Amino acid sequence: MQTRNTFSWIKEQITRSISVSLMIYIITRTSISNAYPIFAQQGYENPREATGRIVCANCHLANKPVDIEVPQAVLPDTVFEAVVRIPYDMQMKQVLANGKRGALNVGAVLILPEGFELAPPDRISPEMKEKIGNLSFQNYRPTKKNILVIGPVPGQKYSEITFPILSPDPATKKDVHFLKYPIYVGGNRGRGQIYPDGSKSNNTVYNATAAGIVSKIIRKEKGGYEITIADASDGRQVVDIIPPGPELLVSEGESIKLDQPLTSNPNVGGFGQGDAEIVLQDPLRIQGLLFFLSSVILAQIFLVLKKKQFEKVQLSEMNF
């Protein structure tokens, strides 16, 4: 009897462990599929390559514009706005993972100079919080607080993203200096064409993997196609699988060439990158400049007064 109870207890524990593991897997998989910045975070230690290219372009193949606006100069330990604009036609719809059409999402990566970081909530003004909305920013790495990522978020609401940034203070951070620094940004709208493992998404064009005659086209129940190509040279048959989403361009009996497009290109999004410069200004330099300008103005005033006094003396001598 005791052996049977022990066996039941072990069986219950194993079942519970499997259930917990399955739940963790589902949650993890869902978060990865819904948050594409994590692809870059998992695959690259730094999102900006030595060539200056931001790695998001490896998956988002189309080139689109992006714009960044930052102040020309900031003082130490100051919160300022870095505004990233990701423009696109709001009427456009993209191909979703299930092959249906839907609205575009946007995402961005902001690469700040060393020492600059996301401003803490208690330092952000109410006006800036209103511009930020419900956005949640995260660091690219726990050790890289100067690199921020956001997305995917609804493009119709957040085609303009405001990052709250805290400038460093050289008085407390000895590796930071009063200099001009570059800021780099990358922004995408819509889904990518290639996954990090090199496989294609359904948001791209599919080409023929062999030359020959299209002998059979099967429309799959859940969408997509199976295209059978009979190779004219050796008679072998090649089957190309088309996922749901792209529109078919070929028909049965048609002669096709190697790498000829079998589908349209459904992609309406793309990725772009840009840069800006910002000066970490020394307050003492500003004070010195103000003192210099004040001295110049006072000197001009004294010159004018001296000139008028001299003219009065000349006039009195002439009258005498």
Curated annotation (Swiss-Prot):
<dbReference type="InterPro" id="IPR024058">
    <property type="entry name" value="Cyt-f_TM"/>
</dbReference>
<dbReference type="GO" id="GO:0020037">
    <property type="term" value="F:heme binding"/>
</dbReference>
<keyword id="KW-0150">Chloroplast</keyword>
<feature type="binding site" description="axial binding residue">
    <location>
        <position position="36"/>
    </location>
    <ligand>
        <name>heme</name>
    </ligand>
</feature>
<dbReference type="GO" id="GO:0005506">
    <property type="term" value="F:iron ion binding"/>
</dbReference>
<keyword id="KW-0249">Electron transport</keyword>
<feature type="binding site" description="axial binding residue">
    <location>
        <position position="60"/>
    </location>
    <ligand>
        <name>heme</name>
    </ligand>
</feature>
<feature type="binding site" description="covalent">
    <location>
        <position position="59"/>
    </location>
    <ligand>
        <name>heme</name>
    </ligand>
</feature>
<dbReference type="Pfam" id="PF01333">
    <property type="entry name" value="Apocytochr_F_C"/>
</dbReference>
<keyword id="KW-0732">Signal</keyword>
<dbReference type="Pfam" id="PF16639">
    <property type="entry name" value="Apocytochr_F_N"/>
</dbReference>
<keyword id="KW-0813">Transport</keyword>
<keyword id="KW-1133">Transmembrane helix</keyword>
<keyword id="KW-0793">Thylakoid</keyword>
<dbReference type="InterPro" id="IPR024094">
    <property type="entry name" value="Cyt_f_lg_dom"/>
</dbReference>
<keyword id="KW-0349">Heme</keyword>
<comment type="function">
    <text>Component of the cytochrome b6-f complex, which mediates electron transfer between photosystem II (PSII) and photosystem I (PSI), cyclic electron flow around PSI, and state transitions.</text>
</comment>
<feature type="signal peptide">
    <location>
        <begin position="1"/>
        <end position="35"/>
    </location>
</feature>
<keyword id="KW-0408">Iron</keyword>
<dbReference type="InterPro" id="IPR002325">
    <property type="entry name" value="Cyt_f"/>
</dbReference>
<dbReference type="InterPro" id="IPR036826">
    <property type="entry name" value="Cyt_f_lg_dom_sf"/>
</dbReference>
<dbReference type="GO" id="GO:0015979">
    <property type="term" value="P:photosynthesis"/>
</dbReference>
<keyword id="KW-0934">Plastid</keyword>
<protein>
    <recommendedName>
        <fullName>Cytochrome f</fullName>
    </recommendedName>
</protein>
<comment type="subunit">
    <text>The 4 large subunits of the cytochrome b6-f complex are cytochrome b6, subunit IV (17 kDa polypeptide, petD), cytochrome f and the Rieske protein, while the 4 small subunits are PetG, PetL, PetM and PetN. The complex functions as a dimer.</text>
</comment>
<keyword id="KW-0472">Membrane</keyword>
<dbReference type="GO" id="GO:0009535">
    <property type="term" value="C:chloroplast thylakoid membrane"/>
</dbReference>
<feature type="transmembrane region" description="Helical">
    <location>
        <begin position="286"/>
        <end position="306"/>
    </location>
</feature>
<keyword id="KW-0479">Metal-binding</keyword>
<dbReference type="InterPro" id="IPR011054">
    <property type="entry name" value="Rudment_hybrid_motif"/>
</dbReference>
<comment type="similarity">
    <text>Belongs to the cytochrome f family.</text>
</comment>
<keyword id="KW-0602">Photosynthesis</keyword>
<feature type="binding site" description="covalent">
    <location>
        <position position="56"/>
    </location>
    <ligand>
        <name>heme</name>
    </ligand>
</feature>
<keyword id="KW-0812">Transmembrane</keyword>
<dbReference type="GO" id="GO:0009055">
    <property type="term" value="F:electron transfer activity"/>
</dbReference>
